[in-house]
Amino acid sequence: MTVTDPIADMLVRIKNANMRRHPTVDVPYSKMKEKIIEILLREGYIAKYEVIGEIPQKYIRVYLKYKGKTPVIQDVKRVSKPGRRYYVNKEEIPRVLGGLGIAILSTSKGIMTDKEARLLGIGGELICMVW
């Protein structure tokens, strides 16, 4: 079955696994998904991840992070979608929950957080927000 929006599919898999308190979740591999997961790891939203398998069955195993029984990722929101792309310039980059969450952008310098994009003074496509 073909997925129309693979990034949204990955985010929903992570969100659903978090809600059910699963220790891991597997998502089909792509370079963009791996970059987004690297950001989640760097920002402390997941414990670790590993790429498993060979193409065409390659996937990413994400190890979820919890504080006691509470998931670290409270919610995720997909902003830019295949049918409606959402671009922001450097002045329009949103602050997620007053700086408690992160926004992930795809810029000309690669995929990065809202803080990194503000420091570089560049905008881009607003992929998602995590808090």
From Swiss-Prot:
Keyword check for Phosphoprotein: no
One GO biological process term: translation
Coiled coil: none
A Gene Ontology cellular-component term: cytosolic small ribosomal subunit
Gene3D superfamilies membership: 3.30.1370.30, 3.30.1490.10
Function: One of the primary rRNA binding proteins, it binds directly to 16S rRNA central domain where it helps coordinate assembly of the platform of the 30S subunit.
NCBIfam families from the UniProt entry: PRK00136.1
Subunit structure: Part of the 30S ribosomal subunit. Contacts proteins S5 and S12.
Family from the record: Belongs to the universal ribosomal protein uS8 family.
Protein name, as recorded: Small ribosomal subunit protein uS8
Organism: Dictyoglomus turgidum (strain DSM 6724 / Z-1310)
